[in-house]
Amino acid sequence: MNVQACSRCGYGVYPAEKISCIDQTWHKACFHCEVCKMMLSVNNFVSHQKKPYCHAHNPKNNTFTSVYHTPLNLTLKKSVAAMGGIDGKEDGEPFKSVLHWDMKSKAGAGAASRLMNERDYWPGYAEGNTWCPGALPDPEIVRMVEARQSLGEGYTEDREQQQGKGSFPAMITPAYQRAKAANQLASQVQYKRGHDERVSTFTPVADTPELLRAKAGGQLQNDVRYTEDGGQQRGKGSFPAMITPAYQIAKRATELASDVRYHQQYHREMKGMASPVGAEGGMTKDSVDRCGQVYSEECDEPRGKGSFPAMITPAYQNAKKANELVSDIKYRQDFHKMKGAAHFHSLAAQDNLVLKRAQSVSKLVSEVEYKKGLENSKGHSINYCETPQFRNVSKISKFTSDNKYKENYQTQLRGHYDGVGMDRRMLHALKVGSLASNVAYKADYKHDVVDYNYLATATPFYQTTMRLVPLKDVNYRQNIDRMKFSSVTNTPQIVQAKINAQQLSHVNYRADYERNKLNYTLPQDAPQLLKAKANAELFSEVKYKEGWQKTKGKGFEMKLDAMSLLAAKASGELASSVKYKEEYEKMKGRALGATDSKLLHSLQVAKMSSEVEYKKGFEESKTHFNLPMDMVNLRHAKKAQALASDLDYRKKLHDYTVLPEDMKTQWAKKAYGLQSELQYKADLAWMRGVGWLTEGSLNLEQAKKAGQLISEKNYRQRVDELKFTSVADSSQMEHAKKSQGLQNAVAYKAGNEQSVHQYTISKDEPLFLRARANAAQLSETLYKSSWEKQKAKGFELRLDSLAFLTAKAKRDLASEVKYKEDYERSRGKLIGAKSAQGDSQMSHSLQMSKLQSDLEYKKGFEDTRSQCHISLDMVHLVHARQAQHLATDVGYRTASHCFTALPTDMKVEWAKKAYGLQSDNQYRADMKWMKGTGWVATGSLHVEQAKKAGELISEKKYRQHPDALKFTSIKDTPEMVQARISYTQAVDRLYREQGENVKHHYTQTADLPEVLLAKLNAMNISETRYKESWSRLRDGGYKLRLDALPFQAAKASSEVISDYKYKEAFERMKGQMLGSRSLEDDLSLAHSVHATSLQSDVNYKKGFEHAKAHFHLPLDMVTLVHAKKAQTLASDQDYRHPLPQHTVLAEDLRLSCAKKAHKLQSENLYRSDLNFMRGVPCVVPGTLEIEGRKKASELISESKYRQHPGSFKYTAVTDTPNLLHAKYSNQITNERLYKAAGEDARHQYTMTLGLPEFIRAKTNAANLSEAKYKEAWHNLRAQGYKLTIDALPFQAARASGDIASDFLYRHEFVKERGQLIGVRNVSDDPRLLHCLRMGQLQSENQYRKEAASSQAQCHLPMDMMYLVHARKAQALASDHDYRTQCHEFTALPEDLKMAWAKKAHALQSEFRYKADLMGMKGTGWLALQSPQIESAKKAGDLISETKYRKKPDSIKFTTVVDSPDLIHAKESYMHCNERLYRLGDAASLHRYTPIPDHPDFTRARMNAMHLSDKVYRNAWEQSRAGGYDFRLDAIPFQTARVSRDIASDFRYKEAFLRDRGLQIGYRSISDDPRTTHFLRVGRLQSDNEYRKAFAKGRSQFHSRADQPGFLQAKRSQQLASDVLYRQPLPQHTSDPEQLGLKHARKAHQLQSDVKYKSDLNLTRGVGWTPPGSYKVEMARRAAELANRRGPGIRGASVEPEAAAALGDHQSRGVNPDASEILHIHKKKTLLM
């Protein structure tokens, strides 16, 4: 901002106080009259010589010489009359009672004025020092003491001398003395007369008070000493103004000048002591002379001193004020009325900044005053409108009006000069005359500039005081309970939640789809459509199976260096635990550029380890946790819970429209009848594996890794105790995923079925012909026959051939030394970023350094979070995008970028190769679909890279042995989340509540299929039929083998119950959730940052009132909607809510039930209504649900984990969910309440006897009959049964014993206290909402009061994305919908899927059902030997703690006969079998006669020579004997040196230190992040500065929606979730015939993952172009044509490279062998 200087004071002028007049810039306070100093405005000033004047003092009008009736002349006239003897005495007598003019005070004022004489002080001071060295005290103390004496006792002594003489002539009256002094002052001659004589009359006497005071005044007047003291005192400000010497002098001078005190002293000491003897006139004259001399010196001194006049010294100001304060009360009143004109220095205490500041400092020093004002001042900030400067200006502006000025002049001054000589108005006129002096004005003005003309907040002592405020004991030690909470609406979590809500909005998704779906027009004769039709024929499953059967059993030759054998070796190395961990150590540390979760975790753990900090911030921070409900692990936990829990197994099925004879209906009847534990478990056993988490699966490993990373024990223990953890996103796991996707027969056939019916192509289409040619090329029969032909022919292979060169290049790529050499060369190339924020690694290092400083972290969080802006086209971002495209399979088929380069350019070739090598995923994917096997060749680039990366990030090599890791339980693991969800689902109240809600929300017709189904179900539930069937089953008996499903299930459950296996799986699962790019992307880190900001006590209380009204939370956010929905499901509140108004028939069943529900107002009646349903959701011990809870209890059992619970005392927390559940259970099971409620309900309810509910109630009553129960119990007891120690009831009792342990409960409660934190407020946490709602529901009044108001406040659109997804997931994961009616599809009657559906509906018996399942085995079931299962097993073995630690001798060998490895080994053995090879070759020996000079035969001989081991050894011996030159600068030597330097830790640190300071060259400090960081750290070292700036900067957060953190979060969300998978592509304006548009149309069809992978499988052989294919022949033909047209020999020498470039350009993604063969053809052509 351009600030101009004021024309008067020279200081900067800000817009708020700016006036532009007379071509100059002024302050409002500086724009005043040059004569009277009255403040002017732009409308009432007069300009003269570019200076402002008022109208009264306009120099053009006021050029007068003399006026007779001036106040001075009138005063002289009155004075002459006053000296007239009797009249003077008569006038003097009444005056004595009005005002006693104190001559001693006048002399004192003159003495005070003489104190400012600089020349008199220093000689006396020096003489005093020499006269009494060391005896003089501090000059300040001497001055104060002597001033008191000279103005006190000295005055009374002189007064007593005068009074004791007895005479009181008129000449010594105050009126006479004043008139005489005024006459002398008015005379210029008298003024200057006697100056030299007076100078010589003053002979310093060392011990006179006047001399000492003059010395002190001279010292104060000294310009050098004054400025020194001012500089020393400028920044202190922390001591009150009352203890300064200037304040003491002013106070003393005020007391001396006080009219009241003067009268008191006069009546006490002087009255009655007057003497008639005349006073000495010389003394009066001498006093007058002294006053004149001092006045002249006072006037002359400032004129020669320039910009620092003596009038601004404190001594002069005090003396001046003492002289001006002689007036009485009325004068002061008038003075206060006129003070706005020029009296800046005499404001009231409320408006005087100095006094106000002094009072404020005194209050701040006082702890009592500070504590009293703390609550009033904590929410305020400095405002310019509240500063004394603004108030002064506003008050002064009242007096600057010309109208009011003239009004006061007319009423108070004009015409009032006549009167007594001592008239107060005349005194006021004299006062104004003295104020009109320019010198005096400027002295006051300079003083005012110091006090008023800059912001009060910028004063040094104000800054010092404000810095001391947070350090007060009150602020520092106050209780955390007094702090209030305020929510910030612009936090990254809320912003991210808004963005997620917009992205997850089904309306937005459908809107974009509706806009885009009509933008495509596809003509019928489009080449893509024709090609699709041709592909439809190629995709025929019949032809596919026919070709597969033909080629399946023919076998093929495999050499020892074949890719399959190399892949087997590589897989052997992959399976090696040692090599895997070695690669893991190498790979560790590559994930640079992301936020360091471990470092942030260490900071978080340090905070959490403080018990005080934990207790202080728990209540505030527990509501700030924001967890998006569509996270991968949560969805996985939900699905796993739905599969693993028994809750929904026997739940009453929802109402679906199915036929009564439907197989699913029969199955539901059977499921409801399964009450025997054996039958129940047998039924569960065949479903084993459906919802079970495979040990070692990707999700488990990720969760285990995340737990390990945030484990406090792992972090704090010694480095040599860390265990080994597996990385879930390693190359092996990714490879297993890709292999599973490629080999998935279901996806392959599903995609084939869809595309079979969608394409039509003409037979003579070129694309169709080419597809036929490709089909011929892809034929395995033709391939093997051509391969046999080529193998028999042989070919020429020279040492400089492409194959050898390629092998060497691959060897160099696989060489670790060369890899490191290339890495070291390329390490510093990515430079050129504009700032450190542009470089991800530098930004990461800077962020780490900031995070390590707790002060920096707290201080700069709110200010710096809006200062990150990264341009999207920076190098590392572009590189990250390209790497992302290369690493994912999404952009695999996108068209390459368009480059303008010559085809023969070597850079183009190298760039193509580099692009293929840079992407690890693309490289492997390319290898996989080219090879067709899914294996990675040993020694390839990505294998070596993976090994190297594993070695680099190996925890074992980097730090320690993994044996010593201990177990730490994490509350938010999938197991714990699953346990919580299981608990929620197992609550009996919620189950019944949901049933009641469902029961009252539909209207049914009597003949609906649902009603018929309900009748059938009622028959199935019949107690009589149940007992009959049970008796028949029981009498028939059954056979139970050792391999029966119940036994197998028991074995599996025993493994599940194993605590050791759980902890082993937990250790593997910890730490997977890593890799967030910034703090905002990581929930834990964002929560830690937010929690730390909340831990600031002062900061929290300071901004609460100001920020609590800024909270805005859209009600349609995903988390809120989900929380509302979850609350309605989880709470009991809506159970008795009045139902929303629906239009129903009067006889509707639901209306009757609703009436009954509204009558249930008594709690007893309410519970009695629940009691009739007792036993319906009864859980049988030993079920999956109970076992899961047992397992959860054992997992969190502290006694098993750490210590015995007997040493802990019991303290119950009454409001926990468990206790609340126990209370409710106790109330529900209360027999007295049950019967009382039953009596009440019996007289208030009438029900139809034929209702299914009534029949079910009768059935339940029969089931709950005590007599029948005891009878059945006695029958069972008489039969007896076998109960072993390891039986499930015993296991359940043990688990329940652990659950009932109060110590475990207390311990888990304490451990869990700080875990559930991070939601932004209570409304975001469903559990907290549930607890609050439970508290409200316990009050019957609260319940009835809130019932009507809250019933209509929940709106949840049923088509929201996550709800739809949850429904689909539920339908897929549960057995619930298995028998539901299939959705309606439009399919042909002869469609294969239609026939299959009919067949599935016909399966009604369990035998046929399971037999049909056996027929479908492999379709939706994971095969035991599938790559996914095998990779999971292998991963489990690799990270198995048991297998890792035990000796190899103890490992038993079990081989799987049909494993891929053995099958592959068998086939390899058959291929490598010499007998079989020769046997097959013998038949062809007699059928072929080669020409001896045939080129192929000749080439075979040459190849035999090349491949001969004997010839090879002879050549080696010859070359070795010949020797060769190997210099010191050879590449191997250089490579060895570089690799040694790379491996040297010292060299690494040395390079790091050299590299640290190279980022120089910034234009300014603001461009250098480190310098800016240091400056900011310097400011932030002051805690006061941080807290003061916090409130100002808290609302300045601005986060761009397109910043990389948000974009990365969006992309990560898109990759991790299935929500946006099918989102339509953005609209582009492109040619309809453009290849990209055609590809986009094709991509829009690939909406499911199955179709996508099936499409990949369909095209597995398309991109692989074997020799002699259409592309190769076309390239060869083009090369030959170009060769013919080439210019002679030169063209021939250039053409091979061009042809190679052309071929490579046309066949990017083609098998490199085709390119090599093409080059061989070209070389042979050239040689010929």
Swiss-Prot record:
Q: Which CDD domains match?
A: LIM_N_RAP (cd09446)
In which tissues or organs does this protein occur?
Expressed in cardiac and skeletal muscle. Not detected in kidney, spleen, liver, brain, lung, stomach or uterus.
**Where in the numbering of this chain does the LIM zinc-binding domain appear?**
4-64
SUPFAM superfamilies in the cross-refs: Glucocorticoid receptor-like (DNA-binding domain)
**What are the start and end residues of each Nebulin repeat?**
173-200, 201-235, 244-271, 313-340, 345-379, 386-414, 416-450, 484-518, 519-553, 555-589, 599-623, 624-658, 659-689, 699-721, 723-757, 758-792, 794-828, 841-866, 867-893, 898-932, 943-960, 966-1000, 1001-1035, 1037-1071, 1075-1109, 1110-1136, 1141-1175, 1180-1203, 1209-1243, 1244-1278, 1280-1314, 1318-1352, 1353-1379, 1384-1418, 1425-1446, 1452-1478, 1487-1521, 1523-1557, 1561-1595, 1596-1630, 1637-1661
Phosphothreonine modifications at? T203
A GO cellular component annotated for this chain's UniProt record is: fascia adherens
UniProt-recorded name of the protein = Nebulin-related-anchoring protein
Q: Which organism is it from?
A: Mus musculus (Mouse)
Q: Could you tell me the gene encoding this protein?
A: Nrap
